[in-house]
Amino acid sequence: MEHTTLEKFKTEVHRTLISKLDLEKLSRVNSSQARQAVAAMVTEILSDQRVPLNFSEQEKIQSDLLDEVFGLGPLEPLLRDPKISDILVNSKDRVFIERGGRLERAEASFRDDRHLLQVIDRIVSRVGRRVDESSPMVDARLPDGSRVNAIIPPLALDGPSL
């Protein structure tokens, strides 16, 4: 399946998943059980859609949606890579990483500015901070010691950056 078509389909599956999720029930189980339950829901949604996907496409959609629900979406694969020392999100579709002292473009991207804003909000809310139009810049230290700097409009002229 073509990349843009796969992304559109993944967005539809994500919407369906969100509408079916019982957050109260998920909050009562451990994270491993919650991940298994959501993975099973994604598998069920994919089979209900009856769209011809090969195994790797199904795995990619499931992995991406689990990262979206339980983590920081498209940043999760980058965060799992121990060789990456820095992640720079200049815009929704311009993500760079530092690996081995070299800056390189990453494959990661966000659906749109709103998606990037949601991920930024998830990150800064973990440390009791907020970022919005009245406070469009945040610089914070995360619990693991890493730093995060986010800028959103109106300060960021080309959309949110992280």
Functional labels for PLM-detected ranges:
Residues 1-104:
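N-terminal anchoring/assembly modules that precede and organize ATP-driven motor systems
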Residues 81, 89, 94-162:
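P-loop NTP-binding catalytic core
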